Swiss-Prot record:
Organism name: Chaetomium globosum (strain ATCC 6205 / CBS 148.51 / DSM 1962 / NBRC 6347 / NRRL 1970) (Soil fungus)
Family under the similarity heading: Belongs to the DENR family.
Matching SUPFAM superfamilies: eIF1-like
Primary location group: cytoplasm
Subunit-structure text: Interacts with the 40S ribosomal subunit.
Protein name (Swiss-Prot/TrEMBL): Translation machinery-associated protein 22
GO CC annotations, alphabetized: cytoplasm; ribonucleoprotein complex; ribosome
Compartments where located: Cytoplasm
């Protein structure tokens, strides 16, 4: 007699923190996880986050432990919200600088700084620039401590358009075009 083939259990994972919904409370994004779960799986939300379910879960705790758990949850939520706000402010203040630098006579290089603030891998972006503009593009360290992408040729305008088109998370207002000219030696 053939045994029935075992069927795998279907597990739902949170769309926000990627943990099973039962463990979302241990992550830092509990509020967002609850909203996601309520929208996508209302039956599971009712089972985990309904007032009755929460009451049943905390009923076995002592009064002091319940208060401590409530304080911890509030503190964790506030901390996560503050971190998210800080990240949003950092992104709003971050500026991508595209600088056209004259090398000699009619030769130029274009320097791009500030992309790391938007979570982009500079090596991948440099490779994309090299492919798109058919030029050499490399990541170099800046004396001030950061890194920049140096692209051979005068492609500053095209780089701005490319960044806006390919990387939608960079706002247009945060891109700054700058032109550096070498000072001519005075004949005297």
């Amino acid at each position: 007699m053939a045994e029935p083939t075992p069927v795998g259990r279907e597990i739902i994972y949170c769309g926000v923190c990627t943990l099973p919904p039962e463990y979302c409370e241990y992550g830092g994004t509990t509020k967002k996880c609850q909203e996601w779960l309520e929208k996508k799986h209302p039956d599971l939300y009712a089972r985990i986050w309904s007032p009755e379910a929460l009451e049943a879960a905390t009923a076995s705790l002592s009064l002091a432990a319940q208060e401590r758990a409530a304080k911890d949850a509030a503190k964790k939520a506030a901390k996560a919200e503050a971190a998210e706000q800080k990240h949003a402010d950092k992104l709003a203040k971050s500026v991508v600088t595209i600088k056209r630098i004259e090398r000699n006579k009619r030769k130029f290089v274009t320097s791009v700084t500030g992309l790391e603030a938007f979570g982009l891998e500079l090596k991948k972006v440099a490779k994309d620039f090299g492919k798109k503009f058919a030029t050499g593009a490399s990541v170099t360290k800046v004396p001030s401590g950061g890194e920049e992408i140096v692209v051979q040729g005068d492609v500053s305008g095209e780089i701005e358009e490319f960044l806006l088109e390919k990387y939608k998370d960079i706002p247009e207002d945060n891109i700054e075009l700058v032109e550096d000219k070498k000072k001519k030696a005075s004949a005297g």
